[in-house]
Regions:
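Hydrophobic alpha-helical transmembrane segments
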Residues: 20-34
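Long, low-complexity, intrinsically disordered N-terminal extensions of eukaryotic proteins, enriched
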Residues: 12, 47-51, 55-59, 416-432
Length: 432
């Protein structure tokens, strides 16, 4: 019986060996090897695309791209070199000269309604325009479907220079996710649409709008950190971002020692959702940005036919500077601010700080020039910049001290004259 088993085993082994070394088996091995190699190539390509998310939003904005992607110059910066060539043929642009901030607000609101079927309250448009005068970063936050991205897109459309919409990706962590990186294998720089627009803006007087769509799906303080730091520099001529670590003779003319100038005519508008899929925005970002809350849809209204506006960034900044001179915050409200600052320091160990005071002194005059009133502007910016800081307080202490703060606001500014501040305090009370 044992001999029969051994004989059967040997015979089976021989058959297996014959199959393994048959032509069919060899071909199967070859096809399997080809399949493995193909899988590796596909895996590498997928990871390359993940590393270069700019390819996604380049396609998203392809209709706004007027240059070709050829690389006849031999430069490692294909798109930027094309801009250098194309700018020589650009025709001069005639900009509007006689216009006011209030007119801009009304015309933009009417244009969005008539041409784009987007409806916004005039107060929100005033806050939007005044916010742009304070910071190069404006955050639009609120419930989904309230028109955050649409508002930012409409602003670029109204200004005759379409906004560049960049869908932020969850894995973004650094500057290269926004502007691209140098590919050692191809010896080319993987340029993004944002890099192209930044380079183009340095040649132009137009207002450029970059929309960071769903900006807090990744940590803003990570991927936008260098932008925030550079924007803090008081002199716009010193605002440069690193692109590459060295300089090549064939590099585009606008790059200085591998750095690109952050254009003073570019604004960043981020849209933010507050849900489980997003990160909270840090104080570092909030302190440097302006915020507009869009929490409800506006009613439809009749809007007359309104033309687009051609206004230079220089003219827009001139209008804001004129507003600051003509509508400086009243001494009475300055005294109220000082008193509120003392109250908050005593009861909550929170203070305004120089940055917030500077923002207040810009925001209020511009909001007034947009057609609003001083106290409404003060209520709005205090609720976002000062009262919001109380969210970090001990919940039990905050709940017990909230009524005293609301009473003090009534005493200082008049009963129910600060509705936005009191509404935010009440919301914090409920969440405590």
């Amino acid at each position: 019986m044992l001999k029969l088993f051994d004989f059967t085993t040997v015979a089976l082994t021989n058959k297996i060996s014959n199959v393994l070394f048959s032509k069919e088996a060899i071909l199967a091995y070859i096809f399997l090897l080809i399949g493995i190699i193909a899988a590796i190539v596909i895996f590498v390509m997928i990871n390359e695309n993940k590393r270069n998310p700019g390819a996604e939003y380049q396609a998203f904005n392809r209709k706004n791209t007027s240059i070709t992607l050829s690389n006849e110059s031999g430069s490692r910066f294909c798109m930027l070199s094309e801009i250098d060539e194309g700018i020589k043929e650009a025709a001069p642009i005639k900009y509007a000269d006689e216009i006011t901030l209030e007119q801009i607000c009304h015309d933009f609101r009417n244009y969005a309604a008539k041409e784009l079927k987007l409806y916004y309250e005039i107060e929100d448009i005033r806050k939007f325009v005044a916010g742009l005068s304070v910071s190069k970063l404006l955050i639009l936050q609120g419930m989904s479907g309230t028109g955050k991205t649409s508002l930012a897109h409409a602003w670029g459309d109204y200004l005759n220079n379409p906004s560049t919409v960049i869908p932020v990706q969850p894995m973004w962590k650094e500057r290269t996710d926004l502007i691209g990186y140098y590919n050692e294998f191809t010896k080319r720089f993987n340029e993004t649409m944002l890099l192209r627009k930044m380079y183009e803006a340095n040649y132009s007087k137009n207002i450029y709008v970059t929309v960071l769509d769903e900006m807090n799906i990744a940590r803003v303080e990570y991927y936008f950190a260098e932008f925030l730091s550079v924007l803090e520099l008081p002199n716009p001529e010193e605002r440069y971002l690193d692109v590459v670590s060295d300089k090549w003779e064939s590099d585009p003319k606008g790059l200085v020692d591998g750095k690109i100038k952050l254009p003073k005519n570019m604004w960043f508008i981020g849209t933010a959702n507050n849900d489980d899929s997003t990160f909270s925005i840090s104080d570092k970002v909030y302190d440097r940005a302006m915020v507009l809350d869009l929490d409800k849809r506006s009613e439809r209204f009749f809007a007359p036919k309104t033309e687009k506006l051609r206004i230079s960034a220089e003219k827009f900044e001139e209008l804001t500077e004129n507003a600051i001179r003509e509508n400086s915050i009243s001494q009475r409200n300055l005294n109220r601010l000082l008193a509120l600052d003392e109250y908050l320091k005593e009861h909550f160990h929170v203070t305004f700080g120089n940055r917030i005071m500077k923002q207040i002194q810009i925001y209020i005059p511009v909001y007034i020039s947009c057609g609003g009133d001083e106290l409404s502007a003060l209520d709005d910016i205090l609720s976002k910049k000062v009262i919001r800081k109380l969210e970090t307080q001990n919940p039990i202490y905050l709940k017990s001290s909230a009524q005293g703060l609301k009473n003090y606001l009534d005493e200082l500014f008049g009963k129910d004259m600060m509705p936005l501040c009191k509404e935010r305090i009440q919301k914090m009370e409920r969440n405590a």
